[in-house]
Amino acid sequence: MQAKKRYFILLSAGSCLALLFYFGGVQFRASRSHSRREEHSGRNGLHQPSPDHFWPRFADALHPFFPWDQLENEDSGVHVSPRQKRDANSSVYKGKKCRMESCFDFALCKKNGFKVYVYPQQKGEKIAESYQNILAAIEGSRFYTSDPSQACLFVLSLDTLDRDQLSPQYVHNLRSKVQSLHLWNNGRNHLIFNLYSGTWPDYTEDVGFDIGQAMLAKASISTENFRPNFDVSIPLFSKDHPRTGGERGFLKFNTIPPLRKYMLVFKGKRYLTGIGSDTRNALYHVHNGEDVLLLTTCKHGKDWQKHKDSRCDRDNTEYEKYDYREMLHNATFCLVPRGRRLGSFRFLEALQAACVPVMLSNGWELPFSEVINWNQAAVIGDERLLLQIPSTIRSIHQDKILALRQQTQFLWEAYFSSVEKIVLTTLEIIQDRIFKHISRNSLIWNKHPGGLFVLPQYSSYLGDFPYYYANLGLKPPSKFTAVIHAVTPLVSQSQPVLKLLVAAAKSQYCAQIIVLWNCDKPLPAKHRWPATAVPVIVIEGESKVMSSRFLPYDNIITDAVLSLDEDTVLSTTEVDFAFTVWQSFPERIVGYPARSHFWDNSKERWGYTSKWTNDYSMVLTGAAIYHKYYHYLYTHYLPASLKNMVDQLANCEDILMNFLVSAVTKLPPIKVTQKKQYKETMMGQTSRASRWADPDHFAQRQSCMNTFASWFGYMPLIHSQMRLDPVLFKDQVSILRKKYRDIERL
């Protein structure tokens, strides 16, 4: 028994010694190898590897949390080839591994929200018109601040758009100029806009200076160099791209079937040599001269004749036969191949023309790909499968083509029709990254009216907006809040405001009534107000200005708002009918008093008219129903300059609201019934409400029209000839068969 114990102890000791020798030898060899590498690197002056690189394997899980610069310098691993090391060191962006979590300071945005600071322009620095438009769009936005201490994001005033060294717009010595900025901080929380980078012959994406930890809003950026959740891919746009507004899409009506004269078209340069030449040189294989027109020309550049091939003369001749605009507007699909760079002007041209883009640019990070689902608006092709493009697009069902075409128009008008929209979309994407808890989802970005008009600060629930009831399977609100704007003192029980209050309160759809007291006289006593079945809340305006009627009051508990002037004359039946109509069109303004706009050729300006014509483009908010979200948009989206103008004139607030809603919906308001007179004509002439009789009042409204159109960059108002009346309205049938029979007597 004792012998067995001795043998067991001896065997255990031997095993321990063997294990100790084995692990000790491995560690000794590793340390010797490590010391030799250190000695070798020391002799060659190489960077000493960090001790963190020799942590045990279980530390690999901590890799995502390493500092970005430490990860960036990890080029001394034993498994990295010399070629990989050279490629890493020659990367166009030294901060290639930057992400919002590692290269952005969120603390700057917590205190003052998302504010953007633009550096003051330096004397003697040339700035291209396109970059001036970008800076103007930022400075005119609600994000702009002139105080750098309040800023969350910084934008250079130095022109970084064109970094092609052969371009006359190229800014020299940009590296030293940027480094001298006292707020640069290695680019942290900075945004750099760029359209062109690199030059002949390779057109790399190097912008020519160290961007540090700055974000890039860049055109023609490749997926290889694009830093997800950090950079923003923007479209390539020309110097003639409008600063604000922009033309609407060219799709005026939907044709069924949605096929045009040409199936697939392209007209552009053919590069005979160099980068981007492979695809365009092969387009002639697909061109059939009938419904597939892919036209190229060799006539560009100074030395094109030196490189011309046997096809150039034939291509040049056929190229001149067709008008590009005619092709563009009569084609179902438009080919968008890469050029010298990945992006192309053809991309935006196809979107505007409702020609479905067929992308043929491998490795291009499509514009705003972080939020836009391009599969709903474009066909993503592969340069290597060029010959399969015709058969692929011919196999697309007509229903799908119609949906693609409609989506091109939405995306064009929502995000691409002006420099301002491109810039604001870029800023909104960055803001969503910072405040992820209230960021917009894919449905908002890819469905009308788009991410620029749906402000997540209002609500994180889509059902609180008037645009998504059908998507969510929700019914429109069943109740409304009446908001009566009172500006005259209450001196008689027969005043129109009291009659209006009683009529609105009797509506079966009325939840409450809010009286906004903007009168200079003190509030009347409670017993002066009539008794009603619904609550009546009187709010005394602090500033007593016109814009206060559109403030997003917390007292408004319903989504629907019935906006009323104090001298409006409406019956309960008229209120009920207008509300039932609004339930079918919750995103629009629905009401009674209609007005119109027109273009005055003699004065070359917009005009305003209250004449009774066969069409209208505005429904005044003195007797109208709309969604309360427009109160929030009016207050937080529109610039202070327009609201200050309205307050100073005590006029035009209803016109501005119509501009806003039409700009959002791209639709006209809706007039109900043929009622024309909606004002009480017996109001005292000493009251503020008699401003309608003031001769200057009409002239002011003419001026407002042009000021508003100037800010929007275009005329958003849309004419309509539709009027909605009750079923059987004035038909020769029994009055008992009519639901809104009282309307016929009014």
Curated annotation (Swiss-Prot):
One of its GO terms (molecular function) is protein homodimerization activity. Its main location: Golgi. Residues 27-746 are lumenal. The chain crosses the membrane at residues 6-26. This is Exostosin-1. Pfam families: Exostosin_GT47, Glyco_transf_64. It is found in: Golgi apparatus membrane; Golgi apparatus, cis-Golgi network membrane; Endoplasmic reticulum membrane. The gene is EXT1. One of its GO terms (biological process) is mesoderm development. Residues 1-5 are cytoplasmic. Changing C298Y: Reduced GlcA transferase activity. It catalyses: 3-O-{alpha-D-GlcNAc-[(1->4)-beta-D-GlcA-(1->4)-alpha-D-GlcNAc](n)-(1->4)-beta-D-GlcA-(1->3)-beta-D-Gal-(1->3)-beta-D-Gal-(1->4)-beta-D-Xyl}-L-seryl-[protein] + UDP-alpha-D-glucuronate = 3-O-{[(1->4)-beta-D-GlcA-(1->4)-alpha-D-GlcNAc](n+1)-(1->4)-beta-D-GlcA-(1->3)-beta-D-Gal-(1->3)-beta-D-Gal-(1->4)-beta-D-Xyl}-L-seryl-[protein] + UDP + H(+). Keywords: Disulfide bond, Endoplasmic reticulum, Glycoprotein, Glycosyltransferase, Golgi apparatus, Manganese, Membrane, Metal-binding, Signal-anchor, Transferase, Transmembrane, Transmembrane helix. It comes from the Eukaryota. Glycosyltransferase forming with EXT2 the heterodimeric heparan sulfate polymerase which catalyzes the elongation of the heparan sulfate glycan backbone. Glycan backbone extension consists in the alternating transfer of (1->4)-beta-D-GlcA and (1->4)-alpha-D-GlcNAc residues from their respective UDP-sugar donors. Part of the heparan sulfate polymerase, a dimeric complex composed of EXT1 and EXT2. Could also form homooligomeric complexes. Interacts with NDST1. Glycans are attached at N89, N330. It is an enzyme of class 2 (transferase). Changing G268E: Reduced GlcA transferase activity. Changing R346K: Reduced GlcA transferase activity. UDP binds at K267, K269, Y271, R280, Y319, Y324, R346, E349. Changing S344F: Reduced GlcA transferase activity. Belongs to the glycosyltransferase 47 family. Its EC number is 2.4.1.225. It comes from Cricetulus griseus (Chinese hamster). Disulfide bonds join C98-C103, C109-C152, C298-C312, C334-C355, C652-C704.
